Amino acid sequence: MHDIRALRADPAAFDAALGRRGLPASASSLLALDADRRMAQTRLQDYQARRNALAKEIGQGKRQGIDTSMLEATAVALRDEMEALEARSASLDAEQKSLLERLPNTLDAEVPTGPDESANVILKQVGEPISLPFSARQHFELGEALGMMLFDAAARLSGARFVVLRGALARLERALGQYMLDLHSTEHGFTEMQVPALVNDATAYGTGQLPKFTEDLFRTTDGRWLIPTAEVPLTNLVADSVVDEASLPMRMTALTDCFRSEAGSAGRDTRGMLRQHQFHKVEMVCITRPEDSDAEHERMTRCAETVLENLGLAYRRVFLCSGDTGFSAARTYDLEVWLPGQQAWREISSCSNCRDFQARRMSARYRGADGKVAGVPHTLNGSGVAVGRALIAVMETYQREDGSIDVPAVLRPYMGGLERISA
């Protein structure tokens, strides 16, 4: 949510920020609405003062035995006018909130300007794309040949964009998630959390999924939402609260199922596990002081990179451009991993600094050592990493010509010492 005071202070900058997102200028209409809203509030305060003065005058008159019928009639008329003005003020408040809540976060000045992913900037690359001495197969070809990746069975159970994993591949995916959680909680200073997979409207609103992106979510018949990422419940743990500055930064991590409708992905990645309705992901969330959020963003991104480095996967860090940065983010780094079977770089992690955008939506604050509210914290989130995509990358990177798959050394303790997966 945007701070209306910032809009009042510099409407030109506000419109320029919207322009970078490819959106039309809105400052003038928002300021006109804001002026009407503030005028209604001022008039309402004047009416309240008049009502209080009348009540005092009526009370004094009655104590003195004076006829107060005229004053009482005036008070009744004033009450009716106040009710109409209160309704008008509430309507203007709701209209302003509705307009502001649909506008995306302001991008950092350093974010590259561009219309789509073609304008993203590669910041660094670690490792070279592996070149196998045989024709590399894609993960679904490997998994189906092993009899451990059952797409037809999943389609019978649930429809398209689901998978059933079996045997050693199911264990390998579990090992990846456990390894990531252990790494983040024991070496990276994150507190492991278990969170609900169902959230209410207010929670989905706080992180920016609602009201704009309902088509991307699954909703239950009782009106709750399946989480698209653990970012949603983790970040909202500070909603409607004031946290102590001494407790910041709050670093949390969780491994959850994630659910996405993939409404805008028709025809894309229809084979395999790359784009599914249900998948596992390890998420990292940080709540921090504004002055520390840049350092936390770099730290969080490095935590995700460490996962890929320890798995021996080639990756690159990409700075998302203005047209590719998500609704709630002020800046985002994507990590893309090399998939030998696809001969392509594919996103495996996205790490975002949302500044105070989400915290304002969820009414989060922090207090200093003196007990006074010091300000609005910054929120950050990042994949640490997508477990299914890590499984894909491991399968394609560590495949052998006979279709077997070597298990990366860091995962073998989670696999009972198994070194190779074969039919």
Swiss-Prot record:
GO function term, MF aspect, one: serine-tRNA ligase activity
InterPro entries in the cross-refs: aa-tRNA-synt_IIb, aa-tRNA-synth_II, aa-tRNA-synth_II/BPL/LPL, Ser-tRNA-ligase_type_1, Ser-tRNA-synth_1_N, SerRS_1_N_sf, SerRS_core, tRNA-bd_arm
Residues that hold L-serine according to the record: T229, A230, E231, E283, S383
Pathway participation: Aminoacyl-tRNA biosynthesis; selenocysteinyl-tRNA(Sec) biosynthesis; L-seryl-tRNA(Sec) from L-serine and tRNA(Sec): step 1/1
Annotated GO CC locations: cytoplasm
Protein's job: Catalyzes the attachment of serine to tRNA(Ser). Is also able to aminoacylate tRNA(Sec) with serine, to form the misacylated tRNA L-seryl-tRNA(Sec), which will be further converted into selenocysteinyl-tRNA(Sec).
NCBIfam families: serS (TIGR00414)
Similarity-based family: Belongs to the class-II aminoacyl-tRNA synthetase family. Type-1 seryl-tRNA synthetase subfamily.
Protein's name in the database: Serine--tRNA ligase
Lineage: Bacteria, Pseudomonadati, Pseudomonadota, Alphaproteobacteria, Acetobacterales
Gene, per the UniProt record: serS
